[in-house]
Amino acid sequence: MEKILEVQGLKKTFKLSAKQQKIEKTKTKVKVAVNDLSFTAYRGEVFGLLGPNGAGKTTTLRMLATLIRPEAGDAVLDGSSIVKEPEEVRGKIGFLTSELKLEEFFTPNYLFDFFADLHKVPASEKKQRRERLFERFGIDRFAEVKVGNLSTGMKQKVSLVISMVHDPDVIIFDEPTNGLDVLTAKVVTDFLLDLKSQGKTIIVSTHIFSLIEKICDRVGIIIDGRMVMCDSLEAVCNGKTLEDRFFELYEETVSSGSLGAEGGKEN
């Protein structure tokens, strides 16, 4: 298998305000969001990051997408370093997160044109890609409607289409079905499976077990900013359901006091 993403020792901390310290129930002024995180993803696979809220999944994907810079470590994506060559990385990936909001006074058409031009997509390809993606997600009827007047599900569809405007080979999705109704979530999941069939590499974070089981080839379980296990879905489950295996690993990790032993376990 050909490596397309190699993550080595990523670390990221954040300062906590007094209010955040109260919420976190800690006197510590610094939160370690990601701590010595390493894993590998291979070309054409769907790799899932599974963990509870606050485990460091979103921070990890934001570092991979070069939105924030790691304090230590690096990741090489298709030959480009996220630390040394962030602009090259941005040109190779599509990135979707529900936490990045679209400007509500722009229309889907305007946003598609803006990002297509930003990625220097040729006019002929832009037209064909817009028609195909807008029709696929039912956006064509809302192409000139301001984003602020769209439903939550339609906004997520527009965000998804924009992340694919330049037809990237590597797509990073942070909680892609978060907050969506079941019908829209199915549309998004089916699209991920379609991308998988096209040979795209997908890195996806979620806390939804069924999504991992449905689309992922390999999974990394992340707890408290550390990778506690990383392997094929079959090997991680070890004859059990993913949910049962996750909570088993979680209890083992908490009871051992290690919260993700140094470097994690990857096969």
Where are these regions (language model features)?
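Conserved ABC ATPase "signature" region
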Residues: 113, 117, 124-142
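Conserved ABC ATPase signature
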Residues: 146-150
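Helical segment within the ABC ATPase nucleotide-binding domain
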Residues: 186-198
